[in-house]
């Protein structure tokens, strides 16, 4: 760009008419005037802006991906999908991680995994998340848009329970996990990613990190946001519990 100080990104969330959050994305050379104009624009359309530095997935999507992945990881461990979804709903999340994967498309998740692997190269972590995504993709179970994903759907697109074929590859564990442990896994995996975003300078304001989490993807509203939640828990306990779960 000839005028890099005028270059700025504006990231809306879907569905746009319902989601209140907008991320304003600063480039390395973005000037204060551009930021101010973007803030004014977002406020004029009755949305809530947060300002973050440019980075892969920005802030909100960066934190929600681990939420989805942790839900899928628990499936591969034999934890019943119903327990995972119930744990998330009881925490106040609008959608459980498995339903959210179906809603956003399993095919999209597989594409993101391939693109991220290509970008990260040897540093890309190998775990069972890609395996389950690619397996579902091969089965043609691409999510709600295909009327077949982790959930079954009727001809009108209404969910009709979990797909039992999932247990062919990932049989249920003989032991049922503690609900609190499942909830902590879902919470901590997001909170730690928010901390990393703050440490790396993607997120510049703790308050905006909390607001972005609650408005952007519905992080347990009662908690005040991931960073406030860690503060409530206290550093010693949060650090110890993170080591145990993540």
Question: PLM features: residue spans?
Answer:
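N-terminal glycine-rich phosphate-binding loop for ADP-containing cofactors
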Residues: 1-246
């Amino acid at each position: 760009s000839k005028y890099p100080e005028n270059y700025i990104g504006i990231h809306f969330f879907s569905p746009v008419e319902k989601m209140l959050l907008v991320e304003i994305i600063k480039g390395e050379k973005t000037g204060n005037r551009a930021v101010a104009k973007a803030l004014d624009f977002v406020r004029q359309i009755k949305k809530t802006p947060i300002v973050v530095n440019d980075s892969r997935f920005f802030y909100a999507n960066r934190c929600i991906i681990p939420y989805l992945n942790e839900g899928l990881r628990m499936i591969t461990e034999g934890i019943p999908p119903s327990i995972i979804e119930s744990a998330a709903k009881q925490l106040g999340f609008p959608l459980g991680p498995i339903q959210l994967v179906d809603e956003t498309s399993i095919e999209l998740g597989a594409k993101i995994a391939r693109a991220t692997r290509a970008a990260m190269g040897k540093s890309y972590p190998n775990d069972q998340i890609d395996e389950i995504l690619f397996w579902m993709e091969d089965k043609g179970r691409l999510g709600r848009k295909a009327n077949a994903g982790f959930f079954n759907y009727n001809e009108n697109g209404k969910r009709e329970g979990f797909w039992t074929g999932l247990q062919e590859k990932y049989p249920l564990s003989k032991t049922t996990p503690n609900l609190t442990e499942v909830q902590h896994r879902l919470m901590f995996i997001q909170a730690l990613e928010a901390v990393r975003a703050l440490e790396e300078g993607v997120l510049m304001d703790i308050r905006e990190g909390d607001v972005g989490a609650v408005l952007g993807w519905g992080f347990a509203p009662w908690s005040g946001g991931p960073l406030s939640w860690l503060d409530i828990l206290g550093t010693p306990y949060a650090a110890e519990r993170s080591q145990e779960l993540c």
